[in-house]
Amino acid sequence: MDFISKTIGLRLGYNKTHKLIWSLSKNNPIFIQTNHFLEYIIKNDPFFCGLILIDFQLMQYIVVHKNQLGNFSPLKNNLPNSINLFLKLKIATEIQSNFNSVFILEERLHFLFFKYLNKMKNLKMLNNLKIKVKIKFLNNPILEPQWIFYKLHQDLYKGINIRRALAKISSNVIKKGAEGVKIQIKGRINGVDKATVIVEEKGKMPLQNLSSEINYYSRALKTVYGLLGVKIWVFKGFLLK
């Protein structure tokens, strides 16, 4: 019998998003590809080495001058040849960030994103394309499941035993303020010919409670013996008390 994980969805009086927020008009469906592009940049570009993308928002905004407020109409100003985009990212890193490093990353991402959009066929004829980029670094990234996956990947790459790595990561997450953590790994672990399952769970994990704030992340981990399926749950507490 299957069980319901209730990872990310509607909560009582609380809506949670998964990775991205779209606030674009229906006339611009070409921006759907941008989430894959941003993940590729942060993973492969040397400027973003050691950074992990936690969440990002892509919104469209309209610039209106004071003299045009009387004649302003969203339907008339939202034309395909004048697109203004606002890109907001949440990034986790081990290195302490300062104003200069954030500014350099924002300028680099602005350049790459603008260059990428100009190459798209439907956007070649654009006369006015403006992009704003804002990057926010998380203060406590260890509570994010994406960061836990990154640390697990590092430990396995160094040759640390998988059970020891899971125990160390889960204990660190509990020490940083999480009320519960659960990590599940499936596949050919340690090169065994038979697929096995390892589950490391510490603290509470009320998956059936709608008022619980649980972050979830799943991804495939590539090893020499094949792919390992990794699922991570992090319980931060109850939203309604």
Curated annotation (Swiss-Prot):
Keywords: Plastid, Ribonucleoprotein, Ribosomal protein, RNA-binding, rRNA-binding
One Pfam family of this chain: Ribosomal_S3_C
GO BP term, example: translation
GO (cellular component) term, any one: plastid
Main localisation: plastid
Localization: Plastid
Family annotation (InterPro entries): Ribosomal_S3_C_sf (IPR036419), Ribosomal_uS3_bac-typ (IPR005704), Ribosomal_uS3_C (IPR001351)
GO terms, molecular function: rRNA binding; structural constituent of ribosome
Organism domain of life: Eukaryota
Annotated Gene3D superfamilies: Ribosomal protein S3, C-terminal domain
HAMAP family (UniProt xref): Ribosomal_uS3_B
Family: Belongs to the universal ribosomal protein uS3 family.
PANTHER family: 30S/40S RIBOSOMAL PROTEIN S3, SMALL RIBOSOMAL SUBUNIT PROTEIN US3C
Subunit composition and interactions: Part of the 30S ribosomal subunit.
The protein's name: Small ribosomal subunit protein uS3c
Designated gene of the protein: rps3
